[in-house]
From Swiss-Prot:
All copies of domain Integrase catalytic, residue ranges: 660-829
MF annotations from Gene Ontology: aspartic-type endopeptidase activity; ATP binding; DNA binding; DNA-directed DNA polymerase activity; RNA binding; RNA-directed DNA polymerase activity; RNA-DNA hybrid ribonuclease activity; zinc ion binding
The organism's taxonomic lineage, starting at the top: Eukaryota, Fungi, Dikarya, Ascomycota, Saccharomycotina
Additional record remark: Retrotransposons are mobile genetic entities that are able to replicate via an RNA intermediate and a reverse transcription step. In contrast to retroviruses, retrotransposons are non-infectious, lack an envelope and remain intracellular. Ty1 retrotransposons belong to the copia elements (pseudoviridae).
RNA-binding: annotated segments: 299-401
Binding site for Mg(2+) 2: D1346, D1427, D1428
Main location: cytoplasm
Record field: transmembrane: none
Positions contributing to Mg(2+) 1 binding: D671, D736
Protein name (database record): Transposon Ty1-PR3 Gag-Pol polyprotein
Length: 1755
């Protein structure tokens, strides 16, 4: 007989009590709360547990042997330890007892055992009142039998057992605490029962079974006093004893009453916590049971509020009541009464359903989740829930059942259930099947119900294309083994067992059938909304019902969890029996390997692959049968779901049923395309499209940008158009999540107009397929139309609009109508339509004169939107017009003939189509009307106008680049077209050139011209002009160079023919003209064809000059000529090679195409002096970009798994057009934060050094009185804009010292807190280099100083506050600054003014005008860089005097005094300098580069072959648009900033040979393509290989009386994008290179001479400033020189003929340069190109040339 253990119960342990409650059997004639009977054995167990030093064995048990008691604990179980009582007071026969005392007259009944002695036991004294047993009772008491019907035996029954075996009675433990009294009473009652005094114990009603005798009362009183000391009694016990100290019976009665009450409360709490309800019992009974429990607990002082009660009730709901958990859990103020109203409603609905449909009545036992037993007459299912107990509860398997054949009788009763035979299954966990559930309709599902599944319901799925069900109970007309392939969301195949019909019987008594697939391998029964829609049933989630299109409600929808469900009670059952699919778990499966274990072991492969591998023995050691495959089908690996997650498959047509309710023009789709690059500013770069969901009518609008106001204007326009034209209001607009749609301006506009924006979901671009497919279609049409017509790309939107007009009139295969017909508009009249690009002649209604031709050739674009005319493009006027005054040009020489349009376009058919339209025009034409020929103000193309050109007789006609393709010629049958002299009425767009105006046959970049033909007004005539054919651009660099070399070697093609000349047909716009072009010499050809401008000077070409450096012979004196020779004499120029290469004129330098796919911004440089080509036009030919309209994005790189979804890429384009030089390079962060240096620094030694530096910095700040230490301010009291954040930064210097600096966050300083006019000045690098050079030549001493905490010497005027250092622990306080703290905007300027004033007033220095931070007096020169000072003087004592003066005011530290005559090493502003006074100076950065470059994470090759040059000629930077996701783009830009930042720092310090490469790559920082990164890596690799190189200076000859300052300049003409030229300058002082500059010219030069002039003019200002500095620092005379390798430039500078400048648009710059040269006494000298060391600044050079030009000054 099971019983609860009362000794373990306490009021504060309800949770454990609830968890350990088991079912009990109680005799019907016994009170279950009767402590005197049913709890006696538990009291004994509690007493046993209380004895911490005592074990109980069968031989020494204190309980008399009785077969009705619980079985003793096995010997293997260890004895109880550490009970609640610390001692046992055992009375034994060996103790000396007082006379007359006996334990009920039988002291021998307690045998002595050694382990029963307690060290705390003491024998009672004689004065102790021991219990006396009455003389009338002389036999021991025995335990009553449960069969007696009474819990306790009376005296007579005790007498009958006097002869029983002697047993000792264990006394109760000693009471040691008032809190232990309830447990002690239980053991005390047990003691009385074992002493045969159970009859005197009060029962439930408080009265004993028999009267207590006086002797028993004495015994009771004495034992209570002995084992319950008064100091440990509870208060209520003491109160009873204070009234009557002998009333022990009242204490026992009260204790039993309390125990009964506590037990009842515990049982109620346990019952309430384990409520179970599934509708199997009436709802009224369930409500009565729950309310009684709650009322009883409230009456006993345990208050259960509504929230807790509702949670407990809902937790126990199952079956169809389970969904109340999710529908009610959000109601915060729900009451128990409201919850039971819902339960009653569901119960009544169930009963009504069962009564109305007896054939589909679910067995009541299906949902008995609270049933714990199952009776099966044939073969019961035994499930071991506890090793010591068995339970006949029935479970369900996790993934498998043996489904028995169901007869599906109209009524299902318990008899039919008991007859079903099933195999034993094992219960895996408590969440499997509902306990007590039978194998009826609901259990044929061969998978578990998921935790979020609503049993007995179908899941509504809008993404599923087919309905799938796990049960065969509802499949009608099933056919097995269907050939159907079904995949799930992870694209895994789902095996299908059968296909059939699913029949519904809805509320309106209508029946509907859909197709259904049977499979046990799914987690839910899925009902496809697509299949329901096919039978005119839709789901309305607003009303949560299934309904027909006419609004008839069929069934309710239940929202359970995150899904929507429909009850299965609307399904009609069938009589089909499907065979078992999955095997039932047997005991054998426990010996197999679980599939999840194998799945994880084999790298998370799928089950199909693993099984196939095991079958084919590719995996050894175990076989397929060794794996438990029962859970393989439905097993969902959480790691696989995360690691292999894919985008949801967008189901085509899944949205249509939700949009059918919209009327025309109420639901729009929109998307934006763009930008299209390389277009004139007047042409649109974007377009926005709109598509109506219902009619599929389309609109397109041009856009020049994607600004908010531009988008808003378009939305305003189309909404007004739809409202006025179609009397409709737009309700919803679907769009993507681009910033142009998600901005606040548009959102407010839509909200104001009551329009709902519908955005696409993340990573589901296919949901926006309507708009994106339209854009793709229009772009395909655009490319095709432009290719077909040959029109320039800036007319791309006209092609888009033409396509939109046509496609709105084409019928859809689905709707059988066109979009225009759906919209109620008229169809397209094809008689008014012309092919896109059709050549036409437009009437000129306003000619220049009456004899001027009245026809202008043009190309038809599309019908006008604003008139009945046509939009026609006029190339000659560079604009479009809206007119009806045109005639179709039917000549065979039109552009449309290039693709053999003889077979595609027929003039007769075109005439027949347009005959009616033109007859209509002719009949209504007004002769003098000009209205129809006026430009349309609404057509954007009318704003496109181009450069006006001079009237020309020659229009180059492009031909095929291959020699095998003969040029097209016109036969005699060709109809002549009169020549038209055109005018340009207004200024034109500068971005459009001729090649982008007229149609071209092939979109070749630089076509090779083999012959030129043209029609003239007087017939055919050939001209013998030695044209230089431009080379076709090859796909590879090698072929390109080969082509150039080959064409150049054929010099005979460039020779002139003085006596014979042929007639070359020249292309014209119309007519023929027999004109003989006169003979043209080579020089004239060069002027006309190549330069198209006369040369300013007649100087000989450079390739005919001598290889020696020859100054220009001018009418100067001999001394001046000697000066020019002396300028060149000491320069570090290379020695000339024995056989110099032949150079050609600068005129032959190639002009690269502007839109080439390979930009001429390269490390190879197309502007190389060794690369030559020619052009055949006065204006440069601009190449059409073949991929301007290209919008397809590359496939996402599958290796890039940094994101779980394909990244949203952005197109990156070159931004180098606006970049002139390296600017704002982001520096490399070499400092550490506080957490990096101290908090999380694992290097203990380094951490200690940083802590030491930290305290040193704080002490220095306090010493300098940086802030006011007298008061700390509360943050709330200070204006927030005057509060500056602060932080600590840590750094390790190259000398190994660790430094800490407490700085203010000046980067976020408010502008009102400092004077923006103040500047922080530092010494210019050119000033430092000049000072160092003069020091070497004059044997100066160089002293290096450092002023500690320099900024803190400057006071601060403004009222500013910062946060205290962290160690002070005052986070909410502020301190006021008194000094110019580090990091503040004004600190640098304040320090500069402070130290400047001190040097001038106290040290007697003066600042050099124009060169801040350079101070001098008669003996000393000082260069100041913040807190670093460099002193130069002839006398070291002069330096020491300055140092002494500085130390009076500042903490000055001498870094290097420089007094040694040996080599001295300095580290001055990053430069590592080796200086031996009077001999040499070497400047480098080897140590710094050795430390910094490896930290850049550049793939260096330290042991490989070293690079000999930073780049090679012929390497082009690809200009393809770069598509890259945002994170990777930022990462690469940051990497480029670090690499170019370091390279720029080194290059401008001393590595001037790298400046061209640095400048070129710096222009591509925002375009970090793979090619750009590789070139950058190559530059860094070269810096690493040559990190030991130094800038070498030697002392100037002492015989030189003057200082010589020289600037060598060079320019590379047109080798940068957009024909910009690269210019470079190198500055030398007394033969020592002190600086260099390489940059892109700010202006576009038109010739090599102009580029050279630009380069020289850029060098003159700095040359003059340096001259002033040198003269200030050294009083010697100075000679200034300019060296260039362009004789034509020198000729211009020294020329006195001003007439040559009047016709040159660069004449102003040339005149200014001439004036500067003359006014500043500059000597302009010529230097050969092979000796021009500035050549390294303008272009990449071959290795040999690069070494030759640099090895004299840097090595």
């Amino acid at each position: 007989m099971e019983s609860q253990q009362l000794s373990n119960y306490s009021p504060i342990s309800h949770g454990s009590a609830c968890a350990s409650v088991t079912s009990k059997e109680v005799h019907t004639n016994q009170d279950p709360l009767d402590v005197s009977a049913s709890k006696t054995e538990e009291c004994e167990k509690a007493s046993t547990k209380a004895n911490s030093q005592q074990t109980t064995t069968p031989a020494s048990s204190a309980v008399p042997e009785n077969p009705h008691h619980a079985s003793p604990q096995p010997a293997s179980v260890p004895p109880p330890q550490n009970g609640p009582y610390p001692q046992q007071c055992m009375m034994t026969q060996n103790q000396a007892n007082p006379s007359g005392w006996s334990f009920y007259g039988h002291p021998s009944m307690i045998p002595y055992t050694p382990y029963q002695m307690s060290p705390m036991y003491f024998p009672p004294g004689p004065q102790s009142q021991f219990p006396q047993y009455p003389s009338s009772v002389g036999t021991p008491l025995s335990t009553p039998s449960p069969e007696s019907g009474n819990t306790f035996t009376d005296s007579s029954s005790a007498d009958s057992d006097m002869t029983s075996t002697k047993k000792y009675v264990r006394p109760p433990p000693m009471l040691t605490s008032p809190n232990d009294f309830p447990n002690w009473v239980k053991t005390y009652i047990k003691f009385l029962q074992n002493s045969n005094l159970g009859g005197i114990i009060p029962t439930v009603n408080g009265k004993p079974v028999r009267q207590i005798t006086d002797d028993e009362l004495t015994f009771l009183y004495n034992t209570f006093q002995i084992f319950a000391p008064s100091q440990f009694l509870p208060t209520w016990v003491k109160d009873i004893l204070s009234v009557d100290y002998t009333d022990i019976m009242k204490i026992l009665s009260k204790s039993i009453e309390k125990m009964q009450s506590d037990t009842q409360e515990a049982n109620d709490i346990v019952t309430l916590a384990n409520l179970q309800y599934n509708g199997s019992t009436p709802a009224d009974a369930f409500e009565t049971k729950v309310t009684n429990i709650i009322d009883r607990l409230n009456n006993n002082g345990i208050h259960i509020n509504n929230k807790v009660a509702c949670q407990l009730i809902m937790r126990g709901l199952s079956g169809e009541y389970k969904f109340l958990r999710y529908t009610r859990h959000r109601h915060l103020n729900m009451t128990v009464a409201e919850l039971f109203l819902d339960i009653h409603a569901i119960y009544e609905e169930q009963q009504g359903s069962r009564n109305s449909k007896p054939n589909y009545r679910r067995n009541l036992s299906d949902e008995k989740n609270d049933s714990r037993s199952y009776t099966n007459t044939t073969k019961p299912k035994v499930i071991a829930r506890n090793p010591q107990k068995t339970n006949n509860s029935k479970s369900k398997t996790a993934r498998a059942h043996n489904v028995s054949t169901s007869n599906n009788s109209p009524s299902t009763d318990n008899d039919s259930i008991s007859k079903s035979t099933t195999e034993p299954i094992q219960l895996n966990n408590k969440h499997d099947l509902h306990l007590g559930q039978e194998l009826t309709e609901s259990t044929v599902n061969h998978t578990n119900h998921s935790d979020d599944e609503l049993p007995g319901h179908l899941l509504l799925d809008s993404g599923a294309s087919r309905t799938l069900i796990r049960s065969a109970h509802h499949i009608h007309s099933a056919s097995s083994n269907p050939d159907i392939n079904v995949v799930d969301a992870q694209k895994r195949n789902i095996p299908i067992n059968a296909i059939g019909d699913l029949q519904f019987h809805f509320q309106d008594n209508t029946k509907t059938s859909i197709k259904v697939l049977h499979t046990p391998n799914i987690a839910y029964d899925l009902l496809s909304l697509n299949e329901l829609a096919a039978v005119d049933i839709t789901a309305c989630f607003t009303k949560n019902v299934l309904e027909r299109s006419d609004g008839t409600v069929l069934a309710p929808i239940v929202q359970y969890g995150d899904f929507y469900w429909v009850s299965k009670r609307y399904l009609l059952p069938s009589n089909i029996s499907v065979p078992t699919i999955n095997n039932v778990h047997t005991s054998e499966s426990t010996r197999k390997y679980p599939y999840p274990f194998i799945h994880r072991m084999l790298a998370h492969a799928n089950a199909q692959t693993i099984r196939y591998s095991l079958k084919n023995n590719t995996i050894t050691y175990f076989n397929e049968s060794d794996v438990d495959w029962s859970s393989a089908i439905d097993y969902q690996c959480p790691d696989c779901l995360i690691g292999k997650s894919t985008k949801h498959r967008h189901i085509k047509g899944s949205r249509l049923k939700y949009q059918n309710s919209y009327e025309p023009f109420q639901y729009l789709h929109t998307d934006i395309f763009g930008p299209v690059h390389n277009l004139p500013k007047s042409a649109p770069s974007y377009f926005i499209s709109f598509t109506d969901e219902t009619t599929k009518f389309r609109w397109v609008y041009p856009l020049h940008d994607r600004r908010e106001d531009s988008i808003l204007d378009v939305f305003t326009t189309i909404l007004a158009f739809i409202k006025n034209q179609f009397q409709a209001s737009v309700l919803v607009i679907q769009m993507d999540r681009g910033s142009e749609y998600t901005n606040r301006t548009l959102h407010k506009f839509l909200e104001k107009n009551g329009i709902t924006p519908c955005y696409t979901t993340t990573a589901d671009s296919r949901a926006h397929g309507v708009a994106e497919r339209l854009n793709r279609t229009l772009l395909d049409d655009c490319r095709t139309q432009l290719q077909c017509s040959g029109l320039p790309n800036h007319l791309w939107f006209s092609a888009i609009e033409f396509s939109t007009i046509v496609r709105n009139s084409l019928a859809s295969p689905k709707s059988k109508k066109s979009a225009s017909q759906h919209a109620g508009l008229a169809g397209l009249d094809i008689s008014t339509l012309l092919p896109f690009g059709q050549p036409v002649i437009v009437n000129d209604h306003n000619p220049n004169s009456k004899i001027h031709p009245r026809g202008i050739p043009g190309y038809a674009l599309h019908p006008s939107r604003n008139s009945y005319g046509y939009i026609i493009y006029l190339p000659s006027l560079k604009k479009t017009v809206d007119t009806t005054n045109y005639v179709i040009l039917q000549g065979k020489e039109s552009r449309l003939d290039q693709f053999n349009y003889d077979a595609l376009t027929f003039d007769e058919d075109l005439n027949r189509l347009t005959a009616s339209y033109h007859s209509f025009i002719a009949s209504n034409e007004i002769q003098e009307s000009n209205d129809l020929n006026i430009e349309s103000d609404h057509d954007f193309q009318s704003d496109i106008e181009l450069h006006p050109e001079q009237p020309r007789n020659v229009l180059s006609k492009a031909v095929s680049p291959t020699d095998s393709t003969p040029p097209s010629t016109h036969t005699e049958d060709s109809k002549p077209i009169s020549e038209i002299n055109l005018r340009a009425p207004r200024e034109v767009d500068p971005n459009i050139s001729e090649s982008n105006i007229l149609p071209s046959k092939k979109r070749s970049s630089t076509p090779q011209i083999s012959n030129i033909e043209s029609t003239g007004s007087g017939g055919m005539h050939k001209l013998n002009v030695p044209l230089l054919a431009p080379m076709s651009q090859s796909n590879t660099h090698e072929s390109s160079h080969a082509s150039k070399s080959k064409d150049f070697r054929h010099s005979d093609s460039y020779s002139n023919n003085e006596t014979n000349h042929t007639n070359v047909p020249i292309s014209s716009t119309g007519g023929t003209n027999n004109k003989t072009v006169p003979q043209i010499s080579d020089q004239e050809t060069e002027k006309r064809i190549i330069h198209r401008s006369p040369s300013i000077d007649a100087s000989p070409p450079e390739n005919n000059s001598s290889h020696n450096i020859v100054p220009i012979k001018t009418p100067t004196t001999v001394s001046e000529q000697n000066t020019e020779e002396s300028i060149i004499a000491d320069l570090p120029l290379p020695d000339p090679p024995p056989e110099p290469p032949t150079e050609l004129s600068d005129s032959f330098k190639e002009l690269p195409p502007i839109n080439s796919r390979q930009t001429n911004s390269s490390l190879g440089g197309i502007g190389d002096s060794n690369a030559y080509t020619t052009i055949n036009s006065k204006k440069r030919s601009l190449e059409d970009n073949e991929t301007e309209i290209k919008v397809s994005r590359d496939t996402w790189n599958t290796k890039n798994m940094r994101s779980l979804e394909p990244p949203r890429s952005k197109k990156r384009i070159h931004l180098i057009a606006a970049v002139k030089a390296v600017k704002s390079i982001k520096p490399i962060r070499t400092t550490l934060r506080y957490d990096e240096a101290i908090t999380y620094n694992k290097d203990i030694k380094e951490k200690e050094k940083y802590i030491e530096a930290y305290h040193k910095e704080v002490n220095q700040l306090l010493k300098m009185k940086t802030w006011d230490t007298d008061r700390y301010y509360d943050r709330k009291e200070i204006d927030p804009k005057r509060v500056i954040n602060s932080m600590f930064i840590f750094n390790k210097k190259r000398d190994g010292t660790h430094k800490a600096r407490f700085v203010a966050r000046g980067d976020i300083q408010h502008p009102d807190t400092y004077d923006t006019g103040m500047q922080s000045n530092t010494v210019h690098h050119y000033a430092l280099m000049t000072s160092l050079s003069l020091a070497l030549d004059n044997n100066y001493y160089i002293t290096q100083l450092d002023i500690s905490s320099a900024y803190l010497y400057a006071d601060i005027k403004e009222e500013l506050y910062i946060r205290p250092p962290p160690h002070l622990g005052m986070n909410d306080k502020l301190i006021r600054l008194k000094k110019s703290h580090y990091g503040l905007k004004q600190s640098g300027a304040n320090w500069y003014e402070t130290i400047k004033s001190y040097l001038i007033k106290q040290c007697g220095m003066e600042e050099v005008r124009g060169w801040s931070c350079v101070f001098k007096n008669s003996q000393v020169t000082i260069c100041l860089f913040v807190d670093d000072m460099i002193l130069f003087s002839k006398d070291l004592n002069a330096n020491k005097k300055i140092i002494t003066t500085l130390k009076k005011q500042y903490d000055t530290k001498i870094i290097n005094l420089g007094e040694s005559d040996n080599e001295i090493q300095y580290d001055i502003l990053g430069l590592e300098i080796k200086y031996q006074r009077g001999k040499y100076m070497k400047l480098g950065m080897e140590n710094s580069l050795t430390e910094k470059i490896p930290k850049l994470n550049v793939p260096l090759n330290p042991k490989g072959r070293k690079l000999s040059a930073p780049g090679q000629p012929g390497l082009y930077i690809d200009q393809d648009e770069l598509e890259i996701d945002e994170d990777e783009y930022k990462e690469k830009v940051h990497e480029m900033q670090k690499l170019i930042g370091l390279a720029s720092y080194v290059g401008y310090k001393f590595r001037f040979d790298l400046l061209y490469y640095i400048n070129t790559l710096a222009q591509h920082i925002l375009f970090p393509s793979r090619q750009v990164l590789d070139m950058t890596y190559e530059l860094i690799q070269f810096m690493w290989d040559t990190r030991d190189k130094q800038l070498i200076w030697h002392k100037n000859k002492p015989t030189e009386p003057d200082n010589k300052l020289v600037a060598i300049s060079d320019a590379s003409y047109g080798n940068q994008p957009y024909y910009k030229s690269q210019i470079g300058n190198i500055y030398l002082l007394n033969g020592k290179v002190i600086g260099g500059k390489s940059t892109k010219a700010s202006l576009t030069c038109t010739s090599t001479t102009e580029a050279e002039i630009h380069a020289i003019s850029e060098s003159v200002p700095l040359l003059n400033n340096l001259s002033h500095l040198v003269q200030e620092l050294n009083k010697k005379p100075i000679t200034k020189g300019l060296l260039t390798d362009s004789k034509s430039t020198i000729s211009i500078i020294i020329s006195n003929n001003e007439e040559k400048f009047r016709n040159r648009f660069f004449g102003t710059k040339a005149m200014r340069l001439r004036d500067e040269v003359s006014g500043n006494h500059l000597h302009v000298c010529y230097i050969e190109t092979k000796k021009n060391i500035a050549d390294v600044m303008t272009k990449p050079l071959p290795i040999k040339t690069f070494k030759l030009l640099t090895n004299k000054w840097i090595h």
